[in-house]
Amino acid sequence: MRKLFILCAFLLQLLSPVYPQQATTATIEPNLKYGKPSKEELSLTSYAPDTTATAIYLFHQGQSDFIYHDGFQLTTEHWVRIKILKPQGVSYADVSVPYYSPTDKDEGQERASEIEGCSYNMENGKCIKTPMKRESISFERFNNLYKILKFSLPAVKEGTIIEYHYKLYSDYFSHIDNWMMQEELPMLYNQYKNHHPSCICLQHRTPGKGLHTSEAKRLLHSCHRT
C-alpha cells in the first residue's frame, strides 16, 4: 500500500500543469532605462501575483539632492513607469502631485518643474510614442498652504505604458518627505537615493520587514565642520 501511495504521488507530480507564462509575468526583470520600455513590458497583459490589478508600477525611482544658492535647497526627482492592464486602469494617466506653497511668501516655498511624460502603445507590431503636450499640465491652488501639480498622459488605453518625470524644489531642506515603497498598485521595482553634503546630518530609518538596504544597520552620518 505504501509503494502504491508513493507511485500515485509521483504520477500526480508529473501530471501537474506548468504555467511558464505566469512565472514570466511574475518575475519581470527590472528595466530602469527611462524612455525605453522593453518588449517584455509592452507585451505584458496581466500580473500573475494579482490578476485583479488594473495597472502596475513597473518602476518608481526617486533621488534627492541638496543644492546651494543663497542657502540650501532640497531637490527631489521622480521617474515613474506604469503599465495599464485593464480599462479601469486608465485613470492612473491622470496624475496629481500636491506640494507646499503657502500664500505667505515669507514662509518659504516648494515648486514643481521639469515636468514631462509620454505614452507607449503597440500598433501593427511597432511601438508608438506619444509625448505629453504642455497644455496638459496645470497648477491649481488647493488651499492657502498647498498647490497641486496636475497633468494627463495622452493616448492611454488598455495595454498602454505611461512614463512621467517631475522635479520638486524645496526651501525646506531639513524636511525630506517620506518615501512610499508600496502604493495601492503592485510595485515591481522601487528605489530611492539621497545625496547630501557632509555638513548635513541625516538619520535613515526603514520601518517594515523585508526591505533591502545597502547597509543592515541604521545610519547616522557625522557632521564635519570647517
Question: What spans do the regions from the language model cover?
Answer:
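Bacterial Sec-dependent N-terminal signal peptides
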Residues: 1-26
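Beta-strand-rich, non-transmembrane domain signature
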Residues: 21-226
